[in-house]
C-alpha cells in the first residue's frame, strides 16, 4: 500500500472507531422521556470531542418515519414506546464512516426478529456470482 493509501485507510479506521464509540454511548441514552434533541446534541458533542467532525447532522427517526429526520433547536419531542433509528456520520479529514442502529422501545420483539431474519437471509443469498 502506498503512503497515500495508508493515510486514507487510517482516516477511515479512525472515523470508524469514533463512530463505534459514539454510537454505543448514544444508543444507551435512548429511552422513554428523553428528548430527541438531547440525544442528538450528545452524539454531536462527542463526535467533536473525539475527532474532526460530523459528516451530517445526527438523524433520529421513529416508527414509520423515513430516515434522516433531524431534531430542530427547539424540538421537545420525547421518546415513547416506539422503534427508533439513530443515524450518525463521522468524518476524519473528509473520509466518512456512517452507521445506523435501531433501538426497540416498542416492546414488539416480533418485528425486530423478523428484520433480523430478513437480514440474515439477504446475507446468505449475497455473494460473488449471485445474479441480481
Residue ranges and their predicted role:
Residues 1-132:
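Active-site neighborhoods and metal-handling regions in enzymes and metal-associated proteins
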Amino acid at each position: 500500500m502506498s503512503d497515500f493509501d495508508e493515510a486514507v485507510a487510517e482516516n477511515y479506521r479512525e472515523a470508524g472507531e469514533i463512530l463505534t464509540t459514539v454510537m454505543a454511548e448514544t444508543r444507551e441514552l435512548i429511552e422513554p422521556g428523553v428528548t430527541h434533541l438531547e440525544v442528538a446534541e450528545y452524539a454531536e458533542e462527542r463526535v467533536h470531542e473525539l475527532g474532526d467532525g460530523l459528516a451530517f447532522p445526527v438523524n433520529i427517526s421513529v416508527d414509520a418515519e423515513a430516515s434522516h429526520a433531524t431534531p430542530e433547536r427547539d424540538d421537545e419531542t420525547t421518546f415513547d414506546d416506539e422503534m427508533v433509528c439513530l443515524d450518525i456520520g463521522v468524518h476524519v479529514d473528509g473520509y466518512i464512516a456512517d452507521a445506523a442502529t435501531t433501538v426497540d422501545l416498542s416492546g414488539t420483539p416480533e418485528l425486530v426478529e423478523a428484520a433480523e431474519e430478513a437480514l440474515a437471509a439477504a446475507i446468505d443469498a449475497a455473494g460473488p456470482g449471485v445474479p441480481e
